[in-house]
Amino acid sequence: MPTLNYPDSSPLKPAELQVLRAQYEKEGDYVGIQTKFNYAWGLIKSNARTDQQEGVRLLSEIFRAAPERRRECLYYLALGNYKLGNYGEARRYNDLLLEKEPGNLQAASLGSLIDDKVSKEGLMGIAIVGGLALAAGIVGGLVFKGAAKRR
């Protein structure tokens, strides 16, 4: 995966993430939105897929429950979905952020990464479909040829 080129893009150290997790767990059923956001942010930055999934889930909860916090969730929802390979969702959140902040360089950079991934995967899909069609044509030709010899 291409890397994001700014200081905020590297994962937290395990001890740093543990501090956020401990605060989140300490607040239990009454976890504050800021605590939940901080923990989700740390999870999104992780290289572990399960952490990223949990981060996206927590940010989605904040996005739905706290309209006043939506703007700050958008970038990390886009980033988390990008890291998980959910490029359609990543683009949707990133585009919403760019509508609100057209000059946001991080979002513009992430948008380019999303577009590059979608293009590469689209070309890969075309190549796979083309290969399958070619294989089906060869098998069909061999079956047809074998049937013609039996007559």
UniProtKB/Swiss-Prot annotation:
Entry keyword annotation includes Membrane: yes
Sequence ranges on the Mitochondrial intermembrane membrane side: 145-151
Bilayer-spanning residue ranges: 124-144
Keyword Transmembrane helix assigned: yes
Main localization (coarse): mitochondrion
Pfam families named in the record: Fis1_TPR_C, Fis1_TPR_N
First and last residues of every TPR repeat: 71-104
Spans within the Cytoplasmic topological domain: 1-123
Keyword list, A-Z: Membrane, Mitochondrion, Mitochondrion outer membrane, Repeat, TPR repeat, Transmembrane, Transmembrane helix
BP GO annotations: mitochondrial fission; peroxisome fission
GO molecular function ontology, one term from the record: lipid binding
Recorded GO CC terms: mitochondrial outer membrane; peroxisomal membrane
Location in the cell: Mitochondrion outer membrane
Topology versus the membrane: Single-pass membrane protein
Job of this protein: Has a role in mitochondrial fission. Has a role in outer membrane fission but not matrix separation.
Protein family membership: Belongs to the FIS1 family.
Domain writeup: The C-terminus is required for mitochondrial localization, while the N-terminus is necessary for mitochondrial fission.
Name recorded for this polypeptide: Mitochondrial fission 1 protein
Recorded name of the encoding gene: fis1
